[in-house]
UniProtKB/Swiss-Prot annotation:
One GO-annotated biological process of the protein: L-histidine catabolic process to glutamate and formate
Function: Catalyzes the conversion of urocanate to 4-imidazolone-5-propionate.
PROSITE patterns linked to this entry: UROCANASE
EC numbers, comma separated: 4.2.1.49
Residues binding NAD(+): 52-53, 130, 176-178, 196, 201, 242-243, 267-271, 277-278, 326, 496
Signal peptide: none
Assigned keywords, A-Z: Cytoplasm, Histidine metabolism, Lyase, NAD
Catalytic function, reaction form: 4-imidazolone-5-propanoate = trans-urocanate + H2O
Name of the protein described by the UniProt record: Urocanate hydratase
Cellular localisation: Cytoplasm
Cofactor: record remark: Binds 1 NAD(+) per subunit.
EC primary class: lyase
Length: 561
């Protein structure tokens, strides 16, 4: 039987100013869908997998072709509906409505489990969209670099007097998200030892300059770390190995007086025990075969390995090493496997990122549909021009230009908040209008943002008012972005932490240089981050309440206005 998800063809987004669709409002989602499957972008494009275990861009190759064909013929008064990667309908709407509305992997809560999802997936009735895979705004590993960088910098501020020079970070996973860690660490001034069980992943990160060196033994990797930290250099090494073995071994060596990491985290694809985590002692080839032949055994073995992995992380924490969960739900699995103390160490959002979320600051990103890197460099300069006092942001943009290799369509990410997003979006649109840019740009974000996600083990962990699991907020965010006129809007379940543990929404808007686009940008790029300020103000955070007042938000049930 032919696998409808396998195809050896190579997909790359069109470049330049020529349209393949009827307008830029439909050309933009077409190009970004194709860009998600570019071999320089996606982790496993032949299987439609973009990143994050089995995060896909379309349900099957037939669905991909139908989506692409529909986008090419869609008018400016029609909207395409996509249900878990399948184009299910086209309906008459209006010019300011989204051109695409996407819902991926959503399940009624009682049935929101990996077992039930995997049954549906096997029958061809569902698709796991992760966050930006099924919403067509993945820009490669750069997409999470700055968030990881901000986390490491803040950890340095809190634990090491503001400097990570001569320090080293231990982590696991070099997939589409985890691959950001070594580069983010180096940008923050630290060394990084990243454990990865699939050698092709290490090689991919070497090729795209996200990791500096490769090691095949722990001793070899530690020798590199020792040399670099003593010299005050910031460099990274990808170690071929299994984190469930390497982490406990490092604990053992640390307790015997050996090397001690300065920060410990992990970004393996532990959110998906069947597809995302290699059990201890298994080969990659064996894992691939048994996922099909004996999925229950794979999951059981992976979960047991994760427990060992987390036990080691808690041992580091107990020894005084700053340790953080980076949002892959590995603590939850370890607890379910009987390790009661799995949540001893915090998640990265409550530990380091939440004050940014309170001001609507999060992962603002844009991509140049022209395919020309110069368009991104020009927008970088515009960001600096419009944020003259923000030296931290300027330093980030300089480092990003120097260190980050573009994957697929040239793109940039920078964390900015309420007010700045709208100003930058309008400026980019004006640059398109004036011919400064060779083609329109799309502006979007990760679903990991201040107002667009409910994820009690990640973004909304330990909320001040206990509202961690309330998922009205991402639903309201998606509805408001739809009403505001985003070019495409998505609502997903299970991204980052897996089935049953998150709901989240995304939006993308196309800046094509028109006055219509400017009006939509003004609404969308104000309202979207404003929902994050609203959500955190409702939870009682003073920073968010002050921001809401300062920005003049009307929040009747919160501010009484």
């Amino acid at each position: 039987m032919t696998n409808p998800r396998h195809n050896i063809r190579e997909i790359r987004s069109p470049r330049g100013p020529e349209l393949n669709a009827k307008s830029w409002m439909t050309e933009a989602p077409l190009r970004m869908l194709m860009n998600n499957l570019d071999p320089d972008v996606a982790e496993n494009p032949n299987e439609l997998v973009v990143y994050g275990g089995i995060g896909r861009a379309a349900r099957t190759w037939e669905d991909f072709d139908r989506i692409a064909a529909t986008l090419k013929t869609l008018t400016e008064e029609e909207t395409l509906l996509v249900q878990s990667g399948k184009p299910v309908g086209v309906f008459r709407t209006h010019k300011d409505a989204p051109r695409v509305l996407i819902a991926n992997s959503n399940l009624v809560p009682h049935w929101a489990t990996w077992d039930h999802f995997n049954e549906l997936d096997k029958k061809g009735l569902a698709m796991y969209g992760q966050m930006t895979a099924g919403s067509w705004i993945y820009i490669g590993t750069q997409g999470i670099v700055q968030g990881t960088y901000e986390t490491f910098v803040e950890a340095g501020r809190q634990h090491y007097n503001g400097s990570l020079k001569g320090k080293w970070i231990l982590t696991g996973g070099l997939g589409g998200m985890g691959g950001a860690q070594p580069l983010a660490a180096v940008m923050a001034g630290a060394c990084c030892l990243a454990v990865e069980s699939d050698e092709t992943r290490i090689d991919f990160r070497l090729r795209t300059r996200y990791v500096d060196e490769k090691a095949t033994s722990l001793d070899e990797a530690l020798a590199m770390i020792d040399k670099w930290t003593k010299a005050g250099e910031a460099k990274s090494v990808g170690l071929l190995g299994n984190a469930a073995e390497i982490f406990p071994e490092l604990v053992k060596r640390m307790k015997a007086g050996g090397p001690r990491p300065d920060i410990v985290t992990d970004q393996t694809s532990a959110h998906d025990p069947l597809n995302g985590y290699l059990p201890l002692g298994w080969t990659v080839a064996e894992h691939k075969i048994k996922r099909e032949s004996d999925p229950k055994a794979v999951e059981a073995a992976a979960r047991a390995s994760m427990k060992m992995h987390v036990e080691a992380m808690v041992a580091f924490w107990d020894a005084g090493v700053p340790t953080l969960d980076y949002g892959n739900n590995i603590r939850q699995v370890a607890k379910e496997e009987g390790f009661e103390n799995a949540f001893a160490f915090p998640g990265f959002v409550p530990a380091y990122i939440r004050p940014l979320f309170c001001r609507g600051i999060g992962p603002f990103r844009w991509a140049a549909l022209s395919g020309d890197p110069e368009d991104i460099y020009k927008t970088d300069a515009k960001v600096k021009e419009l944020t003259p006092g923000n030296t931290h942001l300027h330093n980030w943009l300089d480092m990003a230009r120097e260190r980050i290799a573009f994957q697929g369509l040239p793109a940039r990410i920078c964390w900015v908040g309420l007010g700045d997003r709208e100003r930058l979006g309008l400026a980019f649109n004006e640059m398109v209008k004036n011919g400064e840019l060779k083609a329109p740009v799309v502006i979007g974000r990760d679903h990991l943002d201040s107002g667009s996600v409910a994820s009690p083990n990640r973004e909304t962990e330990a909320m001040k008012d206990g509202s961690d699991a309330v998922s009205d907020w991402p639903l309201l965010n998606a509805l408001l972005n739809t009403a505001s006129g985003a070019t495409w809007v998505s609502l997903h379940h299970g991204g980052g932490v897996g089935m049953g543990f998150s709901q989240h929404s995304g939006m993308v808007i196309c800046a094509d240089g028109t006055d219509d686009a400017a009006r939509r940008i003004e609404r969308v790029l104000w309202n979207d981050p404003a929902t994050g300020v609203m959500r955190h103000a409702d939870a009682g955070y003073d920073i968010a309440l002050d921001c809401a007042k300062d920005k003049g938000l009307r929040l009747p049930g919160i501010l009484g206005n």
